[in-house]
Amino acid sequence: MEGLVVAAGGDVSLHNFSARLWEQLVHFHVMRLTDSLFLWVGATPHLRNLAVAMCSRYDSIPVSTSLLGDTSDTTSTGLAQRLARKTNKQVFVSYNLQNTDSNFALLVENRIKEEMEAFPEKF
């Protein structure tokens, strides 16, 4: 990306990838920071919702909340919780796909896991 400024210690990393899932092209944008991760998932350039999750020493389930958008749509918060548990980082997730089918969301999550296994340094 042109004009991208990365901190001297490599504290910021950007990673983009796409996948065709059920005939829909889905784009993924990952921004890895020192102790946190931002993940945007969508087909069009919109930020309709945003959730955050982080691990707590008081509970095995990461705490999460919706920061932006429809609070009844728990796709972002659920994904943020699972990624926070897996990475042990504070995770921000913006899931912006119209398809709310749970099987489709599982395909999206599996694609993210594949990318995490292939490029662990990006997460």
From Swiss-Prot:
<dbReference type="GO" id="GO:0043248">
    <property type="term" value="P:proteasome assembly"/>
</dbReference>
<dbReference type="GO" id="GO:0005829">
    <property type="term" value="C:cytosol"/>
</dbReference>
<dbReference type="InterPro" id="IPR032157">
    <property type="entry name" value="PAC4"/>
</dbReference>
<dbReference type="GO" id="GO:0044877">
    <property type="term" value="F:protein-containing complex binding"/>
</dbReference>
<keyword id="KW-0143">Chaperone</keyword>
<comment type="subunit">
    <text>Interacts with PSMG3. Associates with alpha subunits of the 20S proteasome.</text>
</comment>
<comment type="similarity">
    <text>Belongs to the PSMG4 family.</text>
</comment>
<comment type="function">
    <text>Chaperone protein which promotes assembly of the 20S proteasome.</text>
</comment>
<dbReference type="GO" id="GO:0032991">
    <property type="term" value="C:protein-containing complex"/>
</dbReference>
<dbReference type="Pfam" id="PF16093">
    <property type="entry name" value="PAC4"/>
</dbReference>
<protein>
    <recommendedName>
        <fullName>Proteasome assembly chaperone 4</fullName>
    </recommendedName>
</protein>
